[in-house]
Amino acid sequence: MDEIVKNIREGTHVLLPFYETLPELNLSLGKSPLPSLEYGANYFLQISRVNDLNRMPTDMLKLFTHDIMLPESDLDKVYEILKINSVKYYGRSTKADAVVADLSAHNKLFKRERDAIKSNNHLTENNLYISDYKMLTFDVFRPLFDFVNEKYCIIKLPTLFGRGVIDTMRIYCSLFKNVRLLKCVSDSWLKDSAIMVASDVCKKNLDLFMSHVKSVTKSSSWKDVNSVQFSILNNPVDTEFINKFLEFSNRVYEALYYVHSLLYSSMTSDSKSIENKHQRRLVKLLL
């Protein structure tokens, strides 16, 4: 428990290994790989609590998270730490220290207003921006279309779960020699978003990767039609890399399970009020 609290209050990170050789690429647009236990067993524990929250009416979610949904300022904090003075999103600037893509649902918790759902058996969709592997779209590679000689490539990932995000990180670990994942204090600890910071580009591998992508998409520039789910590797990445990734993501999901459990206990408290011991513990933890 002390370690969970420490990660929430101080953040957590991991440096991923560099691979000189790209894995065999086979880009297919339109569908994500399905989840499996191989890519994170903790998710399946954590998703049970997410489903409990997903059943709650959104007006109640807003009430109980109003004071703990602080503005997400993790990207700004990364810019400050790395002394990044200029960034470009999707080619909007010709010169910058970093090229950036934010795939997260910034400062949002749920997708649409909704009443309560009777039971998990009646859940047909994930209405929360939490643990949704379908949120990872091919936009995660969009910065590479605009990458010239920037020092950093920075991605705000919408989720850490599923094969898709691990395959993506494995590719980035051949495109850049330094790839780090961070879950900052100033990110939302209600959601499984995180930041990837990549630097020291491997030009040879980047050229090979972009050649494959452009041949599949039949375009040398980014097209919005490519902003869809995708799969990119036929074969699973090696177990060593998966375990290194899970070393980081498991810390995040353990923290989220604790936070979500407190929130659910607060929302279902016998007091029928936001003034209860679970909510007080939650506020103390996150503020």
Curated annotation (Swiss-Prot):
Top-rank taxon of the source lineage equals: Viruses
Q: One Pfam family this chain carries?
A: Pox_mRNA-cap
Which GO BP terms sit in this record? Answer: DNA-templated transcription termination
Q: Which InterPro entries match?
A: Poxvirus_mRNA-cap_ssu, Poxvirus_mRNA-cap_ssu_sf
Q: List locations, semicolon-separated.
A: Virion
Q: Would the keyword Glycoprotein turn up in this protein's UniProt record?
A: no
Q: What is a single molecular function from GO for this protein?
A: mRNA 5'-cap (guanine-N7-)-methyltransferase activity
Give the main location.
virion
**Does this UniProt record's set of keywords contain Manganese?**
no
Arranged from A to Z, the UniProt key words for this protein are: mRNA capping, mRNA processing, Transcription, Transcription regulation, Transcription termination, Virion
As for family, the record states: Belongs to the chordopoxvirinae mRNA-capping enzyme regulatory subunit family.
What the protein does? Regulatory subunit of the mRNA cap enzyme which stabilizes the catalytic subunit and enhances its methyltransferase activity through an allosteric mechanism. Heterodimeric mRNA capping enzyme catalyzes the linkage of a N7-methyl-guanosine moiety to the first transcribed nucleotide (cap 0 structure), whereas the polymerase associated VP39 is responsible for a second methylation at the 2'-O position of the ribose (cap 1 structure). The heterodimeric enzyme is also involved in early viral gene transcription termination and intermediate viral gene transcription initiation. Early gene transcription termination requires the termination factor VTF, the DNA-dependent ATPase NPH-I and the Rap94 subunit of the viral RNA polymerase, as well as the presence of a specific termination motif. Binds, together with RAP94, to the termination motif 5'-UUUUUNU-3' in the nascent early mRNA.
How is the quaternary structure described?
Heterodimer of a catalytic and a regulatory subunit. Intrinsic methyltransferase activity of the catalytic subunit is weak and needs to be stimulated 30- to 50-fold by the regulatory subunit, which is itself catalytically inert.
**The name this protein goes by in its record:** mRNA-capping enzyme regulatory subunit
Give the species this sequence originates from.
Vaccinia virus (strain Ankara)
